[in-house]
Each structure stands twice: as structure tokens, then as C-alpha cells.
Amino acid sequence: MLHSKSACFCHILFILLFMKLLSPVISSIARLRKWRIDNWINHPVAAQREVLQHLVTSAQYTEFGRKYSFHKLFNVKEFKAVVPIHEYEDLKPYIERMMQGEENILWNEPVYWFAKSSGTSCDKSKFIPVSDESLQYNHYKANKDVLSNYYKYFPSSDLLTGKGLVVGGSHQISKVNDQVQYGDLSAVLIQNSPFWGQWLRTPELSIALLDEWETKIEKLALATADEVVTSIAGVPTW
């Protein structure tokens, strides 16, 4: 028992020292994004136009893009005049086809993951397409930008000297077919997170994605009791 506690203490000490050494490096890299974030803040309209143009250009050869002649849309005014506001029920037929494996419907990349909402309207769950590009350049890049902005104001922070306690929803991943899956958004994000995200978080996936809340809390507490936790994060859709 004594040997086990000693080994655990040494393990924690090693991680703490390692992260202490690595923290300045990571924080310096994170601050490199500062100029980009500042540019968005100083030129918000131009930034939004850039995003819109990227989306329209990328989706111009999809079924949805061809329907509304995306290849002819070059500014916000034209887009608003041609593309009507769509509610979920309007997009549902497209999404259902995507979930069956059809490609080039709403987006120009294959979509293998769908986030299932908790059903805030009409008491029905909605399925939101989550493309790989959305994961990489929306969700995960946003994490980096939040980190970058944090270090802008707290450059000497010890945030990265420990791990982030991840509190997510339940996994409950369901398969539509061999390639397409859907589940809680937090589970989709955790399941597809890059290696650096997995390295900096706790607890392990089997606990973080448990369905039963009381069981999850108990196991989470036991699993992280000896961890160095410096932050709490999650995408709680409940």
C-alpha cells in the first residue's frame, strides 16, 4: 500500500515538473495566434465576409449550392436575396440523405458524424452534420484561440502545468451504417479530439462519457483524486 502511494506521488511529481517545463513553450505558441484574433476584433465585418465567401465557394458544387447558384454569389447582399432562411425542417430531408451516406448534399466533404440535439423544439431531436473541417477549423481551432486569448491576459499562468477536467455528456454513439455515427455533441468532440487534447485532459474516455450521471460523478472523483487538475471544461448540452 505504501509502495503504491509512493509510486503515485512520483508519477504526479513527474507530470507536474514536465508540464511546468512545457507550459512556457505551449503558451508562447498559443500567443502566436494573437495577431489573427486581433484582426478579427478590429475588422469584424470583413472577417464575416471572408467566412461566408469560404462557405459559399466550398459548397458551390453541392446539391444545395447548385440549387441556389452559389457560384454566382459574391457578397452578402446577393446571398440574402437568393438564399431564404431555412429552419431545421427545411434541411431535414438533406440531412437524412447525408446520414445514409450520400455526398455533396449540403457540404463538399463526406460527413461521418452527426451531433444529436436534446430536442428543444417540437420535442424532437435534431441531427446536426459535423464535418471534419468543422471539427478542425471550428471547434478545435476555437479551443486554441481561447487559450491564446487567455495567455494574452495571463502570460504567467500555470494553467498548462496540469490537466483539464472534462465534464461531458453521455457517449451513446449510435451507428447508422458502417461509416456514419451520431451522438451527443460533447461526445463527438471528445471522441474526435486531437492527440494533444487527449494528453491534457482527464478522466479517461470510458469515464468521461458514461451515461449515468451519479455513477459518472463518483468514478470521476475517484479517478482524478490524485491528478493535478488546473481547469474544468466541457460542452454540456443538458
Regions picked out by a protein language model, each given a short descriptive name:
Residues 8-10:
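Cysteine-centered motifs
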Residues 18-47, 52-238:
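Active-site phosphate/ATP/adenylate-binding loop shared across adenylate-forming ligases
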